[in-house]
């Protein structure tokens, strides 16, 4: 019997959608040696993820959906569960980007109900922290990038 857990958050990054998406993908593709910008769907890696337990859990991380300047989706799976993380990017009229991150986790093997609720509680807290961090990092890194571009233009002038 499987159990589902869904989480979703939306925030604003203060830059154009193309800039936000390109910067996000530049960081995301570092994990995938076979990343193909034209069609990265199907790229996958094996990765050990630490969860606080005695030993790390071996997972497969695969890019399962991709639309340039619109969507990036990865599926992380192991023998116990599967988590689909979807990042959607929507350009706004004011030149900012609305970034929505949603996660759907399915536990494939029976897990004691109390354990499941505790895991979900901590997962939601971690998800919120991670989301705020992603928005903050994107805003800060893009700000620094564009400040450096401006400085470089002034030096040439």
What kind of region is each of these model predictions?
Residues 1-41:
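Hydrophobic ligand-binding cavity/cleft-lining segments
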Residues 3-5, 55, 81, 95:
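Residue-level preference for beta-strand/loop junctions
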Residues 14-18, 64-69, 88-100:
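A short, structured loop/turn motif at beta-sheet edges
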Residues 16, 20, 123-126, 130, ...:
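Short amphipathic alpha-helical segments
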Residues 25, 30-84, 133-157:
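Glycine-rich portal/gate segments that line the openings of hydrophobic small-molecule binding cavities
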Residues 79-129, 149-151:
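Beta-strand/loop substructures that line and gate deep hydrophobic ligand-binding cavities in soluble
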């Amino acid at each position: 019997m499987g159990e589902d857990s869904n989480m979703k958050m939306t925030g604003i990054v203060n830059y154009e959608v193309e800039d936000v998406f390109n910067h996000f993908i530049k960081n995301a593709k570092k994990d995938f040696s076979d990343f193909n910008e034209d069609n990265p769907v199907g790229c996958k890696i094996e990765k050990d993820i630490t969860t606080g337990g005695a030993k790390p859990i071996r997972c497969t991380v695969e890019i399962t959906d991709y639309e340039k300047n619109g969507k990036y989706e990865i599926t992380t799976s192991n023998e116990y569960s599967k988590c689909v993380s979807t990042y959607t990017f929507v350009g706004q009229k004011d030149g900012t980007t609305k970034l929505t991150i949603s996660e759907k986790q399915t536990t494939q093997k029976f897990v004691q109900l109390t354990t499941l609720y505790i895991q979900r509680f901590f997962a939601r807290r971690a998800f919120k922290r991670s989301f705020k961090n992603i928005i903050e990092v994107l805003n800060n890194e893009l700000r620094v990038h564009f400040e450096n571009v401006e400085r470089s233009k002034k030096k040439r002038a």
